[in-house]
């Protein structure tokens, strides 16, 4: 099993700290592990089409909003607090439930670029589009998404300091890779990191509510 560190390649199993001060590999007992799973994003690295990659990334990350609502809302409120069909109402509910504004702003940025494709079928992402998304995700602070240290701070630090350059498939990209593919790889990596940060905060919030369930794995 690979340690969750600089390469950020493991999936649901992470080095975490529980209320009982247990350390080591644990399994998260809910559907948030999906957003920490690099294999969900890996197929996108072979797609050489901006619109297709952006749409799939948007759908992956929008699914987080539903998972956040379903996990974080107060038990018994399911009839009244539930995901809408549309992005903006779902995001508004998430913010009302405590989702940090830095994460919300990153989601809005991604959705706004997705909408450019919806309104102009031949739209091409500009360098500024890529940079705006990356800057927005980089602005999400480690203390904001891991306030209760549900995750070991040291194991996360490199990802937060290096950003997308902490990912092996970005660092090890072939020199001869076309610039378009290089930018798409960085986009996939950036949204993967955003997905991780979303999961980090949600798990911290569940810990705050004393509803975080995880089991220590056997050696």
Task: Annotate the PLM regions.
Residues 2-219:
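Amphipathic alpha-helical interface elements
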């Amino acid at each position: 099993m690979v340690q969750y560190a600089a390469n950020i390649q493991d999936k649901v199993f992470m080095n975490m700290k529980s209320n009982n001060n247990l350390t080591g590999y644990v399994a998260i007992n809910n559907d948030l592990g999906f957003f920490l799973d690099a294999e969900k994003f890996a197929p996108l690295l072979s797609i050489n089409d901006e619109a297709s990659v952006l749409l799939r990334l948007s759908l992956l990350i929008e699914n987080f909003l539903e998972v956040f609502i379903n996990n974080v809302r107060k038990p018994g409120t399911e009839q009244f607090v539930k995901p809408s069909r549309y992005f903006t109402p779902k995001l508004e509910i998430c913010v009302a439930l405590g989702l940090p504004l830095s994460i919300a702003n990153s989601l809005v940025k991604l959705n706004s670029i997705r909408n450019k494709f919806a309104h102009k079928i031949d739209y091409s992402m500009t360098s500024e589009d890529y940079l705006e998304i990356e800057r927005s995700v980089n602005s999400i602070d480690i203390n904001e998404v891991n306030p209760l240290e549900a995750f070991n701070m040291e194991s996360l630090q490199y990802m937060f300091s290096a950003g997308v350059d902490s990912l092996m498939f970005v660092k090890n990209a072939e020199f001869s890779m076309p610039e378009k593919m290089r930018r798409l790889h960085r986009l996939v990596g950036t949204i993967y990191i955003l997905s991780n940060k979303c999961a980090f905060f949600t798990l911290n919030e569940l810990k705050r509510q004393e509803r975080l369930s995880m089991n220590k794995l056997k050696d």
